[in-house]
Amino acid sequence: MPEETQVHVVRHGEVHNPTGILYGRLPGFHLSATGAAQAAAVADALADRDIVAVIASPLQRAQETAAPIAARHDLAVETDPDLIESANFFXGRRVGPGDGAWRDPRVWWQLRNPFTPSWGEPYVDIAARMTTAVDKARVRGAGHEVVCVSHQLPVWTLRLYLTGKRLWHDPRRRDCALASVTSLIYDGDRLVDVVYSQPAAL
């Protein structure tokens, strides 16, 4: 009889980013005080779950989000590079409306194709590595629950892929808030449900 396994894919908490840059994979970006509180709220929400492993992206903000979750279950945080943030040409720049990056003609070529996208890691590659990460976690925690801490675009791309939706999308419409939990519920190796929650929401 197939076992039920749950993989809880958590987005990291709020990051201390006073200059408002797109930090991507850059080192040194840690959780803000709010982000630490969000991570603690997720740890509280998952405290009574049957969690046997906590696995995180190698980036600091993901490791810091994973730490209180792992501590609640007397586990060490494990690291999986497949959970890392997506690569992005604009990492290290301000890219909001009216900011310099968009007004620089030298970068316009990077914006030519929103479907791949041309400015970063292809969606299909993100989906492939995130699926690999989740499959490893599911096998590792068969019959139990596992937490994987990652980043907004990888988590959202994974969800689109697993639910059979197109991968290109409007970033403003991602249903993946800070410190949110996307729970993947498996019957054996078959995905039977996806449940989204925001335990850290105010």
Swiss-Prot record:
Gene3D superfamilies the record matches: Phosphoglycerate mutase-like
Keyword hit for Membrane: no
InterPro entries hit by this protein: His_Pase_superF_clade-1, His_PPase_superfam, PGM_Phosphatase
Domain of life: Bacteria
Transmembrane intervals: none
GO cellular component: cytoplasm
Residue location of crosslink Isoglutamyl lysine isopeptide (Lys-Gln) (interchain with Q-Cter in protein Pup): 136
Keywords: Isopeptide bond, Ubl conjugation
MF GO annotations: phosphatase activity
Protein's name in the database: Uncharacterized protein MT0547
Source organism phylogeny: Bacteria, Bacillati, Actinomycetota, Actinomycetes, Mycobacteriales
